């Protein structure tokens, strides 16, 4: 499904709403936004999915699309791969989903809840791209996080194939 179609689906789904466009996220100069993220923020300024459900999720506003480590850990941790992850969604209660903007892993989305963010073997890949993430979150309809269900087919861990010193 394209970003345009997902935006239309958000707009037409009860308990979901789009925020007014507010420009593109400003990111570190060494990173580039994936095309689907640019397309999304050119049309809207974030969204809330299933606002009144048990598990609402907010696609952050452009100003909140920030490097994750300073927010979640309190420092950048430049030596770790998580230093290139940006906050893309929040539950509104201090838990986050992140997206990797490293060229080799660009677009992969991770479960960055406080108890697993940046922990080898605990940071699940929950979507292969921003588009994939939004589609999965819409299909989940505000129920318990899809990647924590028993029937979830794993996409691996953020640290798979990474040499840890």
Swiss-Prot record:
InterPro entries: Knr4/Smi1-like_dom, Knr4/Smi1-like_sf
Domain of life (superkingdom): Bacteria
Annotated gene: yokJ
Subunit: Probably interacts with cognate toxin YokI but not with other non-cognate toxins. The interaction inhibits the toxic activity of YokI.
SMART domains in the cross-refs: SMI1_KNR4
Record's note on what induces expression: Expressed on rich and minimal solid media likely in early stationary phase; not dependent on DegSU. Not expressed in liquid LB, but only under conditions that promote biofilm formation.
Entry GO terms, CC: cytoplasm
Main subcellular localisation: cytoplasm
Stated name of the protein: Immunity protein YokJ
Keyword Protease among record annotations: no
Gene3D superfamilies (UniProt xref): SMI1/KNR4-like (3.40.1580.10)
Observed effect of gene inactivation: Deletion of the yokI-yokJ operon has no visible growth phenotype, however it is out-competed by wild-type cells.
Annotated function: Immunity component of one of 6 LXG toxin-immunity modules in this strain. They promote kin selection, mediate competition in biofilms, and drive spatial segregation of different strains, indicating that LXG toxins may help avoid warfare between strains in biofilms. Mediates intercellular competition during biofilm formation; disruption of the operon disadvantages the bacteria, but overexpression of the cognate immunity protein restores growth in competition with wild-type. In situ neutralizes the toxic effect of cognate toxin YokI.
UniProt KW keywords: Cytoplasm
């Amino acid at each position: 499904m394209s970003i345009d179609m997902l935006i239309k689906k958000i707009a037409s789904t009860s308990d979901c709403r789009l925020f007014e466009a507010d420009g593109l996220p400003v990111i570190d100069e060494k990173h580039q936004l994936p095309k689907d993220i640019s397309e999304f923020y050119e049309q809207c300024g974030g969204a809330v999915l299933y606002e009144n459900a048990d598990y609402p999720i907010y696609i952050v506003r452009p100003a909140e699309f920030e490097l994750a480590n300073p927010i979640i850990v309190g420092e950048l941790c430049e030596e770790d791969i998580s230093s290139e992850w940006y906050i893309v969604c929040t539950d509104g209660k201090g838990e986050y989903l992140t997206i990797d903007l490293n060229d080799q892993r660009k677009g992969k989305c991770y479960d960055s809840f406080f108890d697993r963010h940046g922990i080898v073997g605990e940071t699940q890949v929950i979507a292969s791209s921003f588009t994939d993430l939004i589609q999965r979150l819409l299909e989940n309809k505000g129920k318990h996080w899809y990647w924590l269900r028993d029937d979830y087919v794993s996409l691996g861990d953020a640290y798979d194939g990474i040499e840890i010193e």
